[in-house]
Amino acid sequence: VQHLKPLEHNESRVELSIGAVPLRIEGLSRSYGSLKVLSEINLEAQRNEIVSIVGPNGAGKTTLMRCISNGYEPTAGSVWLNGVKAGRGAPHSVVELGVGRSFQNTSLFSSLTVGECLRLARYRLERQPMFSYRTDLRLPEAALRILKATGLDKRLQEKVINLSHGLKRALELSVVLATEPTVLLLDEPTAGLTKTERILIGEILVDLSKKEGLCILLIEHDLDFVREVSSRIVVLHQGKLLLDGSVDEVVGSDLVRAIYSGEQLNETMEDVS
């Protein structure tokens, strides 16, 4: 790949259900034997929203992401994506319903070039040969915006292994966006990034939610970053959804302070319920 071009409007993936809620979770639970990791989670997320999921280690945040992106994960309950109920199926079937996911540790092939990673992302949609003689590649505007902002559009021939950690994170986000998701799941996208890189990623995510209409779910331990980018914050603790509110409501909550300080929560949780 030597040249990147924007997708024509009629080349883009047709939205699965016009006007449908991008993500709705009903009564979702996940158990491993007798250990209940998630309990009766109910949650909706809309277009143009960045919903941050916070909570201490072991709260069930990454498990929730897995349940959304893999139909085999939930023990009980249901996940609706763009108006379609996601049945029990492998992750690729969920991708076809409009979900894109970026992992805590980048999942790129280090031996491929930047351009090859992007072509691979488009393979399922375009059915073009992975290693074709075409030197151009058409990508959604959202993916192009990140590539241009980070200079990766000028480094298409460079192998992933030679990229900095920050550029690998940006490339993985571009690869996910190349699949044209309507629901974007991000697991600690700022982990290991410099302050400058965190600011850039934050600006890009806000831009994607507002201009591209994406529904973004974000797991993040950097609470300053969460404050800056979030439309809403959801608090998980011991597998339960304890709080779902605006940034100001959650940041100023006594419950959140208690969770992060390790205080006894029994009385506070009774008040919430």
Q: Positions of the model-derived regions?
A:
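Helix-to-loop junction immediately C-terminal to a conserved catalytic motif
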Residues: 69
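Conserved ABC nucleotide-binding domain
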Residues: 87-88, 146-167
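The feature captures the beta-strand-to-loop junction immediately N-terminal to the Walker
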Residues: 54-56
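A short, surface-exposed alpha-helical micro-motif characterized by mixed small hydrophobic
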Residues: 226-228
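Catalytic Walker B motif of ABC-type/P-loop ATPase nucleotide-binding domains
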Residues: 184-188
